[in-house]
């Protein structure tokens, strides 16, 4: 066997085409393994020790398949590329004085190295707490077992070149007719095969043992982050895009997977193997061999890290184009009807193609910079190998080394080329993973503006009386909604809140439900300040039918049962009948199993509102809010539904609040509160308010009577009759 035929074992060389790499085998046969590399990046190089790990390397980069994570309805003009967030730029709940709260989860500004190092170590420390939990000995046992298998596998891996050396030296003798392979090198060949098999076996066992540890850590962190987001206040969610939040969790969990796989299965093993190789070379062949190896490793690592940091700029550009392309595509698809209605298909395609061009440009830079990285790496490594071969050849000439020793040196160094070949990819992905995890952990560190006080107690309802006492509130400091709002909603009565658009009718519910907290004043339920009771008990006591009905992409049965997850099917059917939607459901092909589509887009607005009414009736809370609950219904369905709702309210004595623009729907309310300019302008019954000719309510009523878009002649006639009755009563009083 010639030295040349065995010295190129497992040498990786960059392929000529992006998306592939070439492996030189002992017989010098070139095999091209094509890997799916995003944008021709080095991600296509597979880590042998990680390939079977369940949480495989995340394929960050430009994957437009991630469109599903962008459920935003608003197009960002300049999507932020992922980059390290600083301490001051990390997403936090803005203070009351802040007028420009941060809405992005990423920042593109550079971070000081010292500060970033502290951040990285704090992230790793948080992650370590999840893979080494205090009260879980089973997980600790698995971690210890995985590390033991790792060390055992690397020790055996270093033994492989020694068996190779012994085989070469054993065969480097005169061959006779009685000579057989088993006589000369049988034991070494068997040991070589056993070492390789056991190395692979230990590696796979390590993957299997550590898999549950990694996946448990990923699940735990993702669950905690998701739970924390659900507990954040309304302001937080309105100021951030849902797609960005879901992608932050997705990237953060993938970052955990990569960090665990790279540190446990790549960084630590590579450092251990380099240390063992340097020690072996120094012990067997002298310090010069060890010095060449150590200098090569340091130079190789330095060059790779510096070049990869330079290439990261292009990756950020590709990610920015990817994010923008995802936003454009999802925005267009969600608004499909609008695109078709205005014949703007070509415009949307052009917008999408613009992002593809930006991505294409960045991808070309990624591919060319990858070629520069691979060339530099190969030059450094080839120079080191040449020097090692020269030292080895001199040793053979001097008689201090055998041919087998030369093979041993060659194999020891070449085994290091496998993990080092992925150093650039590992470093870049490690940096990106730390950034992604930092964003996710920052989400966990955010504090909700509305939360239980330390002394909060459950709400004890007596009748459901609601009182706003000198309440002030503003979404933005320069635009106050309420200045000194005070009113009382009697227990068990039907009360309506009306007023011009923007007067804060829906805000009343948001404050009562503690989506927001008032800046001053008190909101009381049966004399209890809602800030002193638990959020859970408060929100269980209030039901709402919102104007924009939120439905899940599930069947009708689930969407109604969401009001009470423990309700039986029969209770769901009864709620549907009360909401006057049973007949519509029965006419559907799959009845209650019918999917409503994303955000309920597969059913009409009126059907959505009736499902929302059924849902809140199933919840059966003592306090009910109806925010334009019948705005999408026809007159007949609205009349029937309101009759059912009124019968429920009358029979059970519930406190109900109706927010309405169509005043005829609340004319039978026990009390009508009219809001204007942040105050209560008027309040009273329908007849009392109509008896005030210059009043706000009277003006709204008259405007709806004369409005050209107002409903049928029968309704107008009925409203005129009501006005005549009021006028007649006034004459009698005078």
UniProtKB/Swiss-Prot annotation:
Residues 1-55 form a transit peptide. InterPro entries: AAA+_ATPase, ABC1_TM_dom, ABC1_TM_sf, ABC_transporter-like_ATP-bd, ABC_transporter-like_CS, P-loop_NTPase, Type_1_exporter. GO terms for cellular component: mitochondrial inner membrane. Residues 93-114 have a biased composition (Polar residues). SMART domains: AAA (SM00382). Keywords: ATP-binding, Membrane, Mitochondrion, Mitochondrion inner membrane, Nucleotide-binding, Transit peptide, Translocase, Transmembrane, Transmembrane helix, Transport. ATP binds at residues 475, 499-510. Pfam families: ABC_membrane, ABC_tran. The keyword Methyltransferase does not apply. GO terms for biological process: intracellular iron ion homeostasis. One of its GO terms (molecular function) is ATP hydrolysis activity. Residues 143-432 form the ABC transmembrane type-1 domain. Its EC number is 7.-.-.-. Residues 165-186, 284, 391-405 are mitochondrial intermembrane. It is an enzyme of class 7 (translocase). The chain crosses the membrane at residues 143-164, 187-210, 260-283, 285-305, 372-390, 406-427. Homodimer. This is Iron-sulfur clusters transporter ATM1, mitochondrial. It comes from Cryptococcus neoformans var. neoformans serotype D (strain B-3501A). The gene is ATM1.
């Amino acid at each position: 066997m010639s030295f040349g035929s065995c010295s190129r074992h497992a040498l990786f060389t960059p392929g000529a085409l992006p998306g592939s790499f070439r492996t030189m085998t002992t017989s010098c046969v070139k095999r091209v393994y094509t890997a799916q590399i995003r944008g021709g990046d080095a991600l296509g190089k597979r880590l042998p020790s990680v390939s079977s790990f369940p949480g495989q390397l995340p394929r960050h980069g430009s994957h437009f398949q991630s469109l599903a994570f962008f459920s935003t309805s608003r197009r960002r003009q300049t999507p932020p590329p992922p980059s390290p967030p600083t301490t001051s730029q990390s997403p936090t709940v803005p203070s009351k004085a802040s007028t420009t709260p941060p809405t992005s989860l990423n920042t593109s500004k550079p971070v000081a190295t010292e500060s970033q190092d502290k951040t990285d170590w704090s992230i790793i420390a948080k992650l370590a707490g999840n893979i080494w939990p205090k009260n879980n000995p089973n997980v600790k046992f698995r971690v210890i077992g995985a590390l033991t298998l790792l060390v055992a596998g690397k020790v055996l891996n270093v033994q492989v070149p020694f068996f190779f050396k012994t085989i070469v030296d054993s065969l480097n003798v005169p061959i006779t007719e009685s000579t057989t392979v088993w006589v000369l090198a049988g034991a070494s060949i068997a040991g070589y095969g056993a070492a390789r098999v056991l190395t692979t076996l230990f590696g796979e066992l390590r993957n299997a043992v550590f898999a549950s540890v990694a996946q448990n850590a990923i699940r735990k962190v993702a669950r905690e982050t998701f739970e924390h987001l659900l507990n954040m206040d309304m302001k937080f969610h309105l100021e951030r895009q849902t797609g960005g939040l879901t992608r932050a969790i997705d990237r953060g969990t993938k970052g955990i997977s990569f960090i665990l796989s790279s540190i446990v299965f790549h960084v630590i093993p590579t450092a251990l193997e380099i240390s063992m190789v340097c020690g072996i070379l120094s012990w067997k062949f002298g310090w010069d061999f060890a010095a060449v190896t150590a200098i090569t490793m340091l130079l190789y690592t330095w060059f790779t890290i510096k070049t990869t940091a330079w290439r990261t700029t292009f990756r950020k550009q590709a990610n920015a184009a990817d994010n923008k392309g995802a936003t454009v595509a999802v925005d267009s698809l969600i608004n499909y009807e609008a695109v078709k209605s205005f014949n703007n298909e070509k415009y949307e395609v052009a917008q999408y193609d613009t992002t593809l061009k930006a991505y294409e440009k960045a991808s070309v830079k990624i591919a060319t910079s990858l070629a520069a990285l691979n060339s530099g790496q190969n030059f450094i490594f080839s120079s080191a190998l040449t020097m090692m071969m020269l030292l080895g050849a001199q040793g053979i000439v001097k008689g201090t080394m055998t041919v087998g020793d030369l093979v041993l040196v060659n194999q020891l160094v070449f085994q290091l080329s496998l993990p080092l070949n992925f150093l650039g990819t590992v470093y870049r992905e490690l940096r990106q993973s730390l950034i992604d995890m930092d964003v996710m952990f920052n989400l966990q560190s955010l504090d909700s503006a509305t939360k239980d006080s330390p002394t909060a107690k459950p709400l004890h309802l007596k009748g459901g009386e609601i009182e706003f006492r000198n309440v002030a509130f503003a979404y933005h400091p320069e635009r106050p909604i309420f200045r000194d709002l005070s009113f009382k909603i009697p227990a068990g009565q039907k009360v309506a809140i009306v007023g011009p658009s923007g007067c804060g009718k829906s805000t009343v519910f948001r404050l009562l439900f503690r989506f927001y907290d008032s800046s001053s004043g008190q909101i009381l339920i049966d004399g209890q300040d809602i800030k002193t009771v638990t959020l859970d008990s408060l929100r269980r006591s209030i039901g709402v039918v919102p104007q924009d009905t939120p439905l899940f992409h599930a069947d009708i049965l689930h969407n109604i049962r969401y009001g009470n997850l423990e309700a039986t099917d029969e209770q769901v059917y009864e709620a549907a009948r009360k909401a006057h939607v049973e007949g519509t459901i029965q006419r559907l092909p799959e009845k209650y199993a019918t999917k409503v589509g994303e955000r309920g887009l597969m059913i009409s607005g009126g059907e959505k509102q009736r499902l929302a009414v059924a849902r809140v009736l199933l919840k059966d809370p003592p306090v009910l809010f109806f925010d334009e609950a019948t705005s999408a219904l026809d007159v007949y369905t609205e009349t029937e539904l309101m009759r059912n709702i009124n019968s429920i309210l009358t029979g059970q004595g519930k406190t109900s609040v109706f927010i309405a623009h169509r005043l005829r729907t609340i004319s039978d309310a026990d009390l009508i509160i009219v809001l204007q300019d942040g105050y209560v302008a008027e309040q009273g019954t329908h007849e009392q308010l109509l008896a005030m000719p210059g009043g706000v309510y009277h003006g709204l009523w008259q405007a709806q009577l004369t409005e050209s878009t107002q409903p049928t002649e029968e309704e107008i006639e009925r409203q005129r009759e009501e006005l005549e009755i009021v006028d007649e009563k006034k004459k009698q009083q005078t």
